[in-house]
Regions:
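Conserved class I S-adenosyl-L-methionine
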Residues: 66-75
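Short beta-strand element of Class I
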Residues: 90-95, 165
Length: 175
């Protein structure tokens, strides 16, 4: 065993900062392969969402050949990389605020040899999405508990012919 860490709840701050404590070993750097897609991250700097594995797989199974896609909450590339590697998106515009997540996304893109089909827009997506008006066939809003604050901007990113918006949110079960 080289490393051991304890992951606490994801921080509620805007960057969704890591709450990992290294118990053994020093480096929090991790490289892994998920359904043929290579990811890299430093678990001490960015959060890792193990709970979205089913959705990552589902998104990777959608044929996006020839499509321009916007990922409004890119993180380390949870959905961006499967869209490029498995779904064969022509190009993905990935919006991300956290510099540590951006570094992980860049490393993942290099590992998967898709950097030429990826544009990363660093900053608050309330601003960066405004630069993507009318370019997308598909917009992905993969954030919990809700992506509602970006719905209008997401729709404005779609081409004039329309497209698909994937949105994530928690909903209450009504009895």
């Amino acid at each position: 065993m080289n490393r051991l860490a304890r992951q606490a709840e994801i921080s509620p701050d805007q960057l969704r900062s890591s709450q990992v404590t290294m118990l053994y070993g020093e480096s929090g750097e991790v490289e892994f392969i998920d359904y043929g897609v290579k990811f890299w991250l430093d678990v001490t700097k960015v959060m890792f969402s193990s709970g979205n594995i089913t959705e990552r797989h589902r998104i990777g199974n959608i044929d996006m050949t020839g499509e321009c896609v916007v990922d409004a909450f890119a993180g380390i590339g949870y959905y961006t990389l499967p869209m490029l590697v498995r779904s064969k998106a022509k190009h993905v515009y990935a919006c991300e605020l956290n510099p540590n997540s951006i570094e992980a996304l860049k490393r993942g893109a290099q590992l998967n040899e898709v950097t030429n089909r990826l544009t990363i827009l660093e900053g608050d997506n309330q601003e960066t999405l405004r630069n993507l008006t009318g370019i997308a066939d598909r917009v992905h809003l993969g954030i919990l508990p809700s992506s509602e604050q970006t719905w209008a901007l997401a729709v404005s990113c779609l081409k004039s012919t329309g497209g698909v918006v994937h949105l994530h949110m928690n909903v209450r079960e009504v009895e």
